[in-house]
């Protein structure tokens, strides 16, 4: 294919080496993004229907510069030369509501080519200056309350936009009989950042589509899958209840209710108080997102076989004992 591409470009008077001059967008190259990109590339190459969702950040990691012999970090506007690969879908924008303000999520679609063309959909936050901060920086500082709330807003923003789209599209095609939803969809959670999507899935099913809570939880447990990216307990995401209640009170209520269901189930299974505490989704005024993912997801894995074994035998050993399947 390389030679064919060179030949086609040469016919147009273009040297393929000019592509070496294109700056890479500084949007990160860690394990999370690499695995997501591999998922998308592989699925398109195999002809499988798989679409990705995320945030369309205005700025990347940072732009390095030197001033008086010292490094300074400047915002990296990766879109300064335009973004020819993304298509803005103004017709599919939607509102995402927080307790204190509402944000408009505008999708931008990027094609992923293979045996079929799949889609990477990235949401851009628009509205007030405050709202637009949600999609401004890739990794905002979270050493302050304001920074922590911004991280939480980011996670809910794209998760809520994604779940709302999936459910709306399903209802348009199949009506409000959600029994076949898990047969037609798998929602893959890439680490704990989008795990709040579980609570939003249940919230929409109960509040908007009038499904019983038990039914919504059952559908979630048949739909979601979770890939863990860290074996360090201190790196697993958790949120103090004050933050969640402040901007997402309905989500806080859903999380508490899921925890009650989980505790009842685990008590009936003969778990000790210590085991239940280790698997708690809500405990000591804190929400534990990894425990939520492990309880709800129909499958849990690491990024490698050894990683998965560590999850089974160490990090989530108690949960694996109760839910070995």
Where on the chain are the PLM-derived regions?
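A conserved ligand/cofactor-binding region detector
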Residues: 1-325
């Amino acid at each position: 294919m390389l030679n064919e591409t060179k030949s086609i470009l040469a016919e147009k008077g273009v040297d393929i080496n000019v592509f070496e001059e294109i700056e890479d967008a500084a949007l990160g190259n860690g394990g999370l993004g690499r695995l997501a990109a591999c998922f998308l590339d592989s699925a398109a190459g195999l002809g499988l229907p798989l679409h990705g969702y995320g945030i369309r950040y205005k700025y990347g990691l940072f732009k390095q510069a030197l001033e008086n012999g010292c490094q300074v970090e400047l915002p990296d506007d990766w879109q300064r030369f335009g973004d020819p690969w993304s298509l803005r879908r103004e017709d599919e924008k939607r509102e995402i509501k927080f307790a204190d303000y509402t944000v408009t999520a505008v999708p931008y679609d990027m094609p992923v080519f293979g045996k079929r063309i799949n889609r990477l959909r990235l949401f851009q936050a628009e509205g007030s200056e405050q709202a637009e901060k949600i999609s401004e920086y890739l990794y905002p500082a979270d050493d302050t309350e304001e920074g922590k709330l911004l991280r939480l807003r980011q996670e809910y923003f794209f998760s809520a936009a994604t779940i709302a789209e999936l459910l709306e599209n399903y209802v348009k095609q199949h009506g409000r009989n959600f029994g076949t939803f898990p047969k037609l969809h798998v929602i893959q959670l890439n680490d704990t950042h989008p795990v709040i999507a579980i609570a939003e899935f249940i919230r929409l099913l109960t509040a908007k589509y009038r499904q019983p809570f038990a039914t919504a939880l059952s559908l979630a447990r048949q739909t979601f899958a979770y890939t863990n990216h860290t074996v360090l307990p201190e790196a697993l995401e958790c949120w103090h209840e004050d933050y969640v209640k402040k901007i997402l009170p309905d989500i806080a209520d859903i999380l508490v209710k899921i925890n009650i269901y989980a505790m009842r189930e685990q008590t009936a299974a003969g778990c000790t108080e210590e085991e239940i505490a280790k698997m708690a989704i809500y405990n000591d005024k804190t929400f534990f997102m990894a425990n939520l993912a492990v309880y709800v997801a129909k499958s849990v894995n690491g990024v490698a076989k050894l990683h998965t074994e560590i999850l089974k035998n160490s990090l989530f050993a108690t949960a694996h004992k109760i839910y070995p399947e």
